[in-house]
Amino acid sequence: RLMPRTTVTGVYDGGTYGALQRVTHHLSRGPENAPLEIFWRIIADRTILAGGAIERPIAFPNNDRPGVMMASAVRSYVNRFAVAPGQSVSVFTNNDDGHRTALDLIALGVGVAAVIDTREGVVAKGNYPLFSGAQVTATNGRLGLSSITIRSKAGSQTLKSDCLAISGGWNPSVHLTCHMNGRPKWREDI
C-alpha cells in the first residue's frame, strides 16, 4: 500500500510503526467529514528503512531574511516546478552540492550572481563567478533580500542578489534507525 503525504513518527517493539498521514491539508476544500490527518499504527514483518539526509544551514547575521533559502529548496523550485526563486541568485556553500545548485539554476536560465564557497582553492564547475575561501557576513534589504555582503582575503564587498541559497552539507537522518538501537557506521566508499 502506498501512503503519500505520510510521515513515520516512531519505531516501536514488534515491528510496530507510528505514521501520520496528512489527508486533506493539501486540498482547498476537502470532502465533507474527511479528517485533516490520520494517525496509523503499522505492524510489519520486514521493513526497509531509507531515512535520507537533512541539509545543514550555515549561520550568519540575518540569515532568516525573506529570500534566503536552503539550496535543496531552491533546487526543488527549479527542478520540480520550473520556478525561478529569484532573478539573480547567489549560493553560499561549503561543499560541492552548492555548485550543483548553481548549475541547475543556469540550466533553467536563472542568473547566478555568485557562488561563495568557504573552502580555499575550489574551482568553478560552470560559468558563474566563484569566490573561494569567502563567506557571507550579512544580508541586506527591507522587504526581502536585495544584496549580500561577503568577506574574503581580498576584503569585503556587496553583491546584488534577490535570492541566497545556502548549503552547509548533509546529515544522515538516523532518528528512526536509532529507535531500533541501530548505530551509524562511516563508510568512505559511499
Indicate residue ranges for each PLM-predicted region.
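Residues forming the flavin
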Residues: 1-190
